[in-house]
Amino acid sequence: MQRIHKIKTKQQVKETISDEAIEQLRDHCACARDLAMIDLLYSTGIRVGELVNLNIDDVNFEARECVVFGKGDKERRVYFDAKAKLHLQNYLKHRTDRNPALFVTLDAPHDRLKISGVEVRLRELGRSVNLVKIHPHKFRRTMATRAIDKGMPIEQVQKILGHSQIDTTMQYAMVNQTNVKASHQKFIA
């Protein structure tokens, strides 16, 4: 029996969200929930499915971390920055419902937010500031790329993203060309 080899296809470098675009999105958030959602996605790199499954009890504000259940119900810890902590606390302070879910709909009965709800909201926010193709997964890719660009070891990025294979993480690591040039000058030139 012959082995069937994979056909090599062009690998497109997928876009990330610029720091300026993130600031534009933040500035145009009309409600505390959206701001908290953007900052949590941006600083943790969690999947949208993990985001909507988060409960308030999964968040440890003191340690600035939360427990997420990834693919295959694998539990892992992710960490968020001070800005995300501030915006999450502000959002929770203004909530009036008793739903244990971290992110809920804005209108009563304040149900747990669904994946499609997050996608639609982010798309709307993106369009409001003339940014096309803003979706939850782009925040994940942006976080991974930023972490690697700043020198975080790929194995640690793999752990944060919850990947079992390093190859998967490598696909997220869209290498910044200016960093490649700087590294070349540092090590070679």
Annotate each language-model stretch with its function.
Residues M1-A189:
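Conserved catalytic core of the tyrosine transesterase superfamily
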